[in-house]
UniProtKB/Swiss-Prot annotation:
Protein name, as recorded: N-acetyltransferase ECO1
Zinc finger (CCHH-type) in chain: 33-57
Cellular localization per UniProt: Nucleus
Family named by the database record: Belongs to the acetyltransferase family. ECO subfamily.
Claim: Nucleus is one of the keywords in the record: yes
Pfam families registered for this protein in UniProt: Acetyltransf_13, zf-C2H2_3
GO cellular component, one term: cytoplasm
Compositionally biased tracts (Low complexity): 95-105
InterPro entries: AcTrfase_ESCO_Znf_dom (IPR028005), Acyl_CoA_acyltransferase (IPR016181), ESCO_Acetyltransf_dom (IPR028009)
Main subcellular location: nucleus
Single GO MF descriptor: protein-lysine-acetyltransferase activity
GO biological process terms held by the UniProt record: chromatin looping; chromosome organization; DNA repair; DNA replication; double-strand break repair; establishment of meiotic sister chromatid cohesion; establishment of mitotic sister chromatid cohesion; mitotic chromosome condensation
Length: 281
């Protein structure tokens, strides 16, 4: 998801990470290539560029390595026949109706999966790992690097970060922002956006409780329902003892792919025939 203040135009290509190219005193030209899988452009004659590409390529396609000790578990799945959720309010484990993964896919059979909440008060590697992932996400979306204050503050809870872990790799993330005002009431940041024109409806300020600041899934794990599962688990764990309804979730000016997800998740059809998306600014 794009940050709410970003000026990125819809459909624009993301800025790709690239180091300073080595000219080698002009005696050797640099051959710029573009990876067809991660879409990064880099110099094939630069050792530094190749190293940066290898790291970026792995993160984009397969996510980041994640220690089993990082994060507080809020959702676990041990196999594809049973999905469970750990309730923070009751401490009990209850089955969920559906798995986010396709049982027919042989490449994901018998994989341990979980969703964790990133604890900002921890000085270990989980905060650094999350920050590294967000650098990748923001570069891909060409978005400002200003969302970390939402989830990593130890003095004021402005929101939370959740990470989807598969076989000790972070393959998806979501940053949720609280839209409550200082008096506990919802703020006036909510808007309706017309899906096809991306135009905001004027003089209408709906109440939304939480906003999706960022949502991202690595390339090899997309179209498996992971993004939807992240939103569902976040709704159940962002506010202690409360499940936020779908209609009170807003999006931070969604990208093209984010808009498609939003339209399916909680878009509403206006009497005019226009599809409206809940957004916030």
């Amino acid at each position: 998801m794009k940050a709410r203040k970003s000026q990125r135009k819809a459909g624009s290509k993301p800025n790709l990470i690239q180091s300073k190219l080595q000219v080698n005193n002009g005696s050797k030209s640099n051959k710029i290539v573009k990876c067809d899988k991660c879409e990064m452009s880099y110099s094939s004659t630069s050792i530094e560029d190749r190293a940066i590409h290898e790291k970026y390529h792995t993160l984009q396609l397969h996510g980041r390595k994640w220690s089993p000790n990082w994060g507080s578990i809020v959702y676990t799945e041990r196999n594809h026949s049973r999905t469970v959720h750990l309730s923070r309010s009751t401490g009990t484990i209850t089955p969920l109706n559906s798995s986010p993964l396709k049982k027919s896919s042989p490449s994901i059979t018998h994989q341990e999966e979980k969703i964790v909440y990133v604890r900002p008060d921890k000085s270990n590697g989980e905060v650094r790992a999350m920050t590294e992932i967000m650098t990748l996400v923001n570069n891909e979306l060409n978005a400002p690097h200003d969302e970390n204050v939402i989830w990593n503050s130890t003095t004021e809870e402005k929101g939370k970060a959740f990470v989807y872990i598969r076989n000790d790799r972070a393959v998806g993330i979501i940053i949720i922002e609280n839209l409550y005002g200082g008096n506990g009431k919802t703020s006036s940041r909510g808007r309706w956006m017309v899906y096809d024109s991306r135009r905001l409806v004027q003089n209408v300020y709906p109440d939304f409780k939480i906003g999706i600041s960022r949502i991202w899934v690595c390339r090899t794990a997309r179209k498996l329902g992971i993004a939807t599962k992240l939103i569902d688990v976040a709704r159940e764990n962002i506010v202690y003892g409360e499940v936020i309804p779908r209609y009170q979730v807003a999006w931070s000016q969604p990208t093209d792919s984010g808009g498609k997800l939003a339209s399916k998740y909680n878009g509403i059809m206006h009497k005019s025939g226009k599809l409206l998306l809940p957004v916030y600014i």
